[in-house]
């Protein structure tokens, strides 16, 4: 469908491949239990590359390598399972004892590409529209690929309801509501790759995250992190971006602190008046 729509003048389409590919490996359960903390996101940051591990219901972990296609530490350099074992021993030594099937997994599992798709228009003539990855494929670094597609469905359903089932009205409205949000989560996912692969190993970055978590605990009505808003709310992605700029979050923290300070002062003032 998208290929046919590309023949329409002005139907812009872009796909950008990340200079990084991926391969999945496994950390199996150990004696029927998780080998790592299942409540944590495990990241092995290595500059422009990384490995992550996410828990599964069977208490194993799926590990994903995000490596460049060529150059040092790339899939082109590390081609076989035996080469992977040597590379892991040097660069991911703590993971090697957790991965008894590393050699076999590395040889068996394919290398995949990561691409961001953007379309300037999603609908045509009030009769056809793109949805999900056809309109806005994104990289997986915010875990929102499927969810953003589900949001398309919810928005299209809402627009059809408001248009009394008139597709010629609903489809342009759906497109208008979703394009900016799709671009926003695509950008946030790409930014999160840099954060995870390059910044997460920095002590300064870890200190910043600790401060953010403290604000979330102490000022829950005023400060919410970007991750929380994206993952655990239905706030539109573009609105999340606006709310989580540094100036906006600084204002939220200031308002929260002012509220915390003012509350006991008002209480003291009230008691003073009563006496």
Predicted regions and their residues:
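Amphipathic alpha-helical interaction segments
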Residues: 52, 69, 75, 95, ...
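Selective for proline/serine-rich intrinsically disordered segments
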Residues: 91, 95-98, 138, 218, ...
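Conserved FAD-binding catalytic core of PHBH/FMO-like flavoproteins
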Residues: 1-114, 118-123
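Non-transmembrane alpha-helical segments in soluble domains
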Residues: 2, 85-89, 157, 175, ...
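C-terminal helical "tail/cap" subdomain of flavin- and related membrane-associated enzymes
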Residues: 158-275
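A structural signal for well-ordered alpha-helical segments within the folded catalytic domains
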Residues: 82, 151-154, 209
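Conserved mid-domain beta->alpha element of the FAD-binding
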Residues: 25, 110-201
């Amino acid at each position: 469908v998208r290929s046919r729509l590309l023949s329409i003048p002005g139907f812009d389409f872009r796909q950008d491949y990340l200079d990084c590919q991926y391969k999945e490996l496994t950390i199996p359960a150990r004696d029927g239990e998780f080998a790592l903390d299942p409540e944590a996101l495990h990241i092995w940051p290595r500059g422009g590359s990384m490995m992550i591990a996410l828990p599964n219901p069977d208490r194993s972990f799926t590990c994903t390598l995000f490596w460049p296609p060529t150059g040092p530490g790339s899939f082109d350099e590390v081609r076989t399972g035996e080469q992977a074992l040597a590379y892991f021993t040097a660069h991911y030594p703590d993971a090697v004892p957790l991965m008894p099937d590393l050699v076999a997994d590395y040889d068996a599992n394919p290398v995949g590409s990561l691409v961001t798709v953007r379309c300037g228009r999603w609908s045509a003539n009030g009769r056809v529209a793109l949805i999900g990855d056809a309109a806005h494929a994104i990289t997986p670094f915010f875990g929102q690929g499927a969810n953003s597609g589900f949001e398309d469905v919810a928005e299209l359903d809402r627009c059809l309801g408001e248009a009394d089932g008139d597709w010629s009205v609903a489809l342009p409205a759906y497109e208008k509501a979703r394009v900016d949000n799709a671009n926003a989560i695509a950008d946030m996912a790409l930014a999160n790759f840099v954060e995870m692969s390059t910044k997460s190993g920095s002590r300064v970055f870890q200190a910043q995250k600790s401060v953010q978590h403290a604000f979330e605990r102490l000022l829950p009505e005023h400060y919410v992190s970007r991750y929380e808003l994206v993952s655990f709310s239905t706030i539109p992605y573009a609105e999340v971006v606006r709310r989580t700029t540094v100036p906006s979050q600084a204002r939220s923290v200031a308002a929260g602190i002012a509220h915390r300070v003012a509350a006991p002062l008002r209480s003291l003032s009230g008691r003073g008046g009563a006496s």
